[in-house]
Amino acid sequence: MLEDVSWPQPPELKGDVKLVLPAWTNREPDWRAEVQPTIRLQGMVKLEHGGAYRGVDVSALQSHVAYSNLVWRLPDLTVLRPEGTLEAALEADERTGDFYARVSSTLDLRMVRPLLDEEQQQGLDLVTFTNPPVISAEVWGHARELERTGLKGRVALSNFTFRGESASGLQTGVQYTNKFLQFNSPRVQRGEQRMSADGVGVDLAAQLVFLTNGFGTVEPMVVTRAIGADIAQKVEAYQFKQPPVAHVYGTIPMHGEDTADLHFELDGGPFEWSRFHLPHISGHVHWLGQQLFLNNIQADFYGGQAAGSAQFHFRPGGEADYQFAVFATNALLGPLTKDMFLVTNRLEGWLWGNLVVTNASTASMQTWDGYGDLHLRDGFIWEIPVFGIFSGVLNGMVPGLGNSRASAGTCTFSITNGVIRSEDMDIRSTGMRLQYRGTLDFDGKINARVEAGILRDMPLFGQVFSTVLWPVTKLFEYKVTGTLGAPKADPVSLVPKVMFLPFQLPFHPLRTLRGLLPEDLGFSPTNAPTLTSPKQN
């Protein structure tokens, strides 16, 4: 034991020593076996000029010392270092190598790093201290077999970091045996933010952390960065502007991700992802190895509600395959399209519908496969260029018709390789009906056919007039190409003008039809900026 101790100047030792010498007739006595067990020592030791034990330096120490039956006892050991003090009662048995101590300390824990094995050092290196921790503990073990070391006590920290993430305070019970570190009822403060748990276990041999019944109101990115850079990178796109309420439990790997099995119950907001801005969201997040599952997601969604789920399967290199389903009701068209397409056009109405993506990759939105449906109620949509391109023509037929509100709109659609296809988009208003058939991709490119039916929905007479004026409906069949923000319409067929002569007297707007039907319809209102596809962030 003494061979592990060094000092620049010998310590001062005062006291009484008693021992039994070997018989004078014994010319070759075994001093260790015969004499050392008889030594009795009572005294005081002082090391005023500092020293070291196995590379652990101290500025000074002192203690009463008792030694008998090969057992050292230091009942009032005081150790000084620049940052603080350690007070301990120590007992060490030379025969067995066992030791036991009661310790109160304000020393920097990094001082004991030379005493730890490589795995223990890695755990200690995760923490940096501005102020030394306050520790009261019992410690026991074997001087030559440090893996048998055990500890039980309490720790309080202030102004420290863990994996670079700062905290203003921590209080916890702590136990350590057999390379397993257990924190009992830990409480962490980060300014006004709080975290707590029933328990946190650290298996240093398996390099795993076990979290039991965690609760917090801390920024999620602080927690994920403390877990590890890889998981932080994968969730950084999901941003809570205020810390949510979180319940967390499960297994966290200290290195890698394959053994992760961590559950989050989150409830809070405002929340942002991609271009979406939501005032409130809640749900269950399950991180399982290289997979991430989002279940029971509920959100306030642009004046309405949305629910959904998602699965992500991460691949080497950072990309992920994923699938998701979203169901929305009573969403406001204007605020939703403003966020999705970055437009300021006047758009109104209520939307509800479903979107199910069965296969996709984060590498490209052109990998999307899926399906869904949309429904519109009481909508004003004419400042969406792909609809507004026909507004002038319809107003020429019947003043105001091209600006009337859509009483209802419906469509079902499929998605294949990032191309959306619908064969039944139907938009209705009083006196008019638009039907779209075609495709739209995530770059905003459109390829569709549009039919505009006049008077079909006019009360009482609409269906009759629409049948009588069947040629008028066919006149408004166009092929639409270009983009959502800059569509181009070309007539598919034109009806001979003579077919309108019987209706010129009762329907005065038909007189101006010639000037209102150019061969190429281009949409360029000064108050309608170009739509940007959701792909462009």
Predicted regions and their residues:
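Small-residue helix/turn framework positions
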Residues: 1-18, 38-49, 57, 71, ...
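Short loop/turn motifs that connect adjacent beta-strands in outer-membrane beta-barrel proteins
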Residues: 25-32, 146-147, 257-258, 362-367
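Membrane-lipid interaction segments
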Residues: 22-39, 49-53, 57
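Short, charged low-complexity linker/loop segments at the C-terminal edge of domains
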Residues: 23-26, 361-363, 483-491
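Gram-negative outer-membrane assembly/targeting C-terminal domains
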Residues: 487-537
